[in-house]
């Protein structure tokens, strides 16, 4: 599992950087950290297990499948957390 998690961590990092550049058009280190931290991943599952799953999908099916897994399982949780964070930062 450790090797899969190591690969999964790298795949998640690449996905996060590409996502930030596509959505925001800027390099945003703090957002990257929020998207990839163990604290955030714990909202999805046990962080090492989540990264290992990403790594397994990548190794067995390739980058597109791993990115799709992240889009289906990680991105929605991050989106909800960001909405909540923005509500706290900019109260109505």
Residues of each region from the PLM?
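RNase III-family endoribonuclease catalytic core
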Residues: 1-92
């Amino acid at each position: 599992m450790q090797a899969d998690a190591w690969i999964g961590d790298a795949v998640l990092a690449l996905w996060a950087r590409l996502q930030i550049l596509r959505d925001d058009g800027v390099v945003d280190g703090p957002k990257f950290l929020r998207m990839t931290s163990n604290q955030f991943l714990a909202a999805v599952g046990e962080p090492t297990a989540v990264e290992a799953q990403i790594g397994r999908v990548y190794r067995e099916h390739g980058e597109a499948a791993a990115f799709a897994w992240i889009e289906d399982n990680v991105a929605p949780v991050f989106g909800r957390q960001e909405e909540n964070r923005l509500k706290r930062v900019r109260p109505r």
